[in-house]
């Protein structure tokens, strides 16, 4: 493999080399003394001495974590929630329009769908500790939300120098940088929260509209589309193949080999070692990395890829629940919602949360924008 394959110095392992007959450990010390100002050491003795020192310390007892009491779930109910998909039309009946198309540059459009006002139970006791306790949250006003994540093309209309670059490829002997993530229709990635907010600011100035990132409450309300399940389309075990782009059986295609590496055959002796990425192996969504367009089904509000494809910045601080619109506590992190093509369902639910520094450019995080009236 043209690379060291041992985790230690193995003297005289290759008998055909010119230094055969020399004690390579002693020779190494001699040369280090000669060319590094007497820095040669008997490293085998050093290691043996340290091992003896550790042995004399006796048994090392681990420090066990404190026992955590079971979380008591508090069941909250909201009148009229959850609701069936066919109720969305009724909720938007008083709206003059439910779809808005903006031309943000010559020939470049961005489509928004109307998200109704409403109330729901935010968070879940079935997720990580940062997803509870749950709380009732009211979305007071309807708002517009991008039906898709902001694309490379849309982002480049304001920041033309940005390049989302590539998704890393395994193996070696590459002839390309990786899997493209910079196609015009793909969602933009490797943009920070600060970058996303600056994009919103400039786009607002150009259009005269109040364009920004959603709060995490707005995001979760929009993502759920009336559902109180883990996903808008069901629970953690639901088949997401036609619904969203998550870590599925297609992830096995990251296991590649050869010059200009191509997917390994399942018959390859290396296959079981290189298909190590965690995944929902019983689902096939047909996508290896993030995709553009409307390949998957929209949720009841008309939004695509809220659970996967790429995760999305919100404008909320990453603080403990219960959720508050204007928390007294502030955080140095901003909340990212949703999962991505490389994440399993349990990390991609409607209530999953992550926190990143506002200056971080993350390989699988993009954003979608909203318009507030």
Where are the language model's segments positioned?
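Short, structured beta-strand segments at or near domain termini in extracellular proteins/domains
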Residues: 363-373
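Second-shell loop/turn segments in exported
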Residues: 144, 182-187
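Functional-site microenvironments in short loops/helix caps that host divalent-cation chemistry
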Residues: 121, 126, 179-182, 193-354, ...
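Eukaryotic protein-protein interaction scaffolds centered on beta-propeller repeats
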Residues: 1-66, 99
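Short, P/G- and charge-enriched loop/turn segments at secondary-structure junctions
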Residues: 98-103, 130-134, 277-279, 353-358
């Amino acid at each position: 493999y043209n690379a060291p394959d041992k985790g230690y110095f193995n003297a005289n392992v290759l008998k055909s080399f010119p230094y055969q007959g020399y004690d390579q450990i002693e020779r190494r010390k001699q040369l280090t003394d000669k060319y590094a100002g007497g820095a040669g050491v008997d490293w085998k003795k050093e290691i043996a001495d340290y091992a003896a020192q550790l042995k004399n310390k006796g048994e090392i007892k681990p420090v066990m974590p404190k026992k955590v009491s079971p979380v008591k779930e508090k069941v909250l109910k909201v009148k009229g929630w959850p609701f069936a998909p066919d109720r969305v039309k009724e909720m938007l009946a008083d709206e003059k329009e439910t779809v808005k198309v903006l031309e943000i540059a010559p020939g470049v459009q961005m489509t928004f769908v109307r998200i109704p006002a409403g109330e729901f139970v935010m968070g879940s006791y079935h997720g990580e500790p940062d997803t509870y306790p749950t709380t009732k949250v009211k979305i007071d006003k309807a708002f517009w939300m991008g039906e898709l994540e902001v694309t490379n093309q849309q982002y480049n209309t304001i920041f033309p120098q940005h390049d989302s670059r590539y998704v890393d490829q395994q193996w070696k002997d590459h002839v390309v940088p990786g899997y493209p993530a910079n196609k015009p229709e793909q969602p933009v990635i490797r943009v920070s929260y600060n970058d996303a907010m600056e994009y919103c600011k400039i786009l607002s100035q150009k259009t005269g509209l109040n364009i920004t990132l959603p709060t995490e409450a707005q995001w979760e309300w929009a993502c759920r589309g009336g559902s109180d399940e883990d996903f808008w389309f069901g629970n953690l075990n639901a088949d997401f193949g036609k619904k969203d782009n998550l870590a599925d059986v297609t992830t096995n295609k990251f296991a590649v080999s050869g010059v200009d590496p191509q997917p390994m055959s399942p018959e390859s002796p290396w296959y079981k070692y290189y298909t190590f990425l965690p995944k929902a192996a019983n689902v096939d969504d047909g996508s290896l990395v993030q995709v553009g367009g409307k390949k998957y089904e929209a949720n009841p509000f008309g939004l695509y890829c809220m659970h996967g494809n790429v995760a999305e910045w919100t404008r909320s601080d990453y603080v403990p629940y219960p959720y508050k619109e204007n928390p007294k506590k502030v955080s140095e992190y901003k909340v990212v919602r949703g999962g991505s093509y490389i994440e399993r369902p349990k990390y991609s639910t409607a209530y999953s949360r992550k926190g990143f520094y506002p200056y971080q450019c993350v390989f699988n995080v993009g954003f979608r924008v909203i318009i507030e009236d």
